[in-house]
Amino acid sequence: MLHAKIRRLPNNMASQVSSTCSDELSPEEQALVVKVWNEGARLYRDLPWRNVDDPYAVMVSEIMLQQTQVARVEKYWQRFMALFPTLDALASAETSLVLEMWQGLGYNRRALALKRTAEICSREFNGLLPESSEELLALPGIGKATAGGIMAFAYQKPSMYLETNVRTVFIHELFPGREKVSDKELEPSVQRTCSAEDPRGWYYALLDYGNYLKSTMPNPSRRSKHHTKQSKFEGSRRQKRAELVRFVLARREASFCELVAALSDFEKKQGREAPEEDIVRSIVNDLVAEGFFSQEGEGENARYLAD
């Protein structure tokens, strides 16, 4: 492969890299590699999780970065790691404390999945994160992209890491003007261009260049076949879920009537109608089933507790 081992490349590295191009890469892929290494060196972001040698810390950052902006994750990641510095520490923590730390990041299911992953690793892997893609994919909340990121960033192993910034670069450089570009079309190039010697540095360069592209032009990843607009949060079921979780965490315990009243007050303050009790009950039942809080008693006597 035509990659260097260092993350920050000097300005003259393009010619050196170009002279070592692999025959298996197309001319377009060779040009992409040269450009990405050089742009990545110029645009490198010194993020806190890039300066640690801890697979668990890398995993936390990758899960937080799912659908959340980097600037917000920076603040939360450092606080989270200070409170839960190891997989064992997270595994033994109260679920309510983990959820409290997560408030403001959104998509609270990620916090529950992260804690369950920590519990599995503590119980089955001696408090360590597995080092194979297959074992990582079996853990809660870890899909193909997250597993690929962990393999590259935590273990310096070549992997398929196709997330939004990476997708942006490959669509922009290899499919100019094309609409509805599928991941199946991108994956062979992503696989072929991944550095065997420094996958970590390679994907850092892709991420930073992709982030730059999105800030300077219409987002190329919108031309992906898989691009979807994030659903509206205001007034959504997701917002109602988040509000009920916040209420139980703050109160530690609440009755169903209190949950109905709290959500009704919240909706009215937003200029919306109070939700029907059946909707509230459906949401509460889902939250209990998913492990956000526990239920004691049934029917009108039920109480909901932060665990």
How should these model regions be labeled?
Residues 297-307:
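Short, cationic-aromatic polyanion-contact patches
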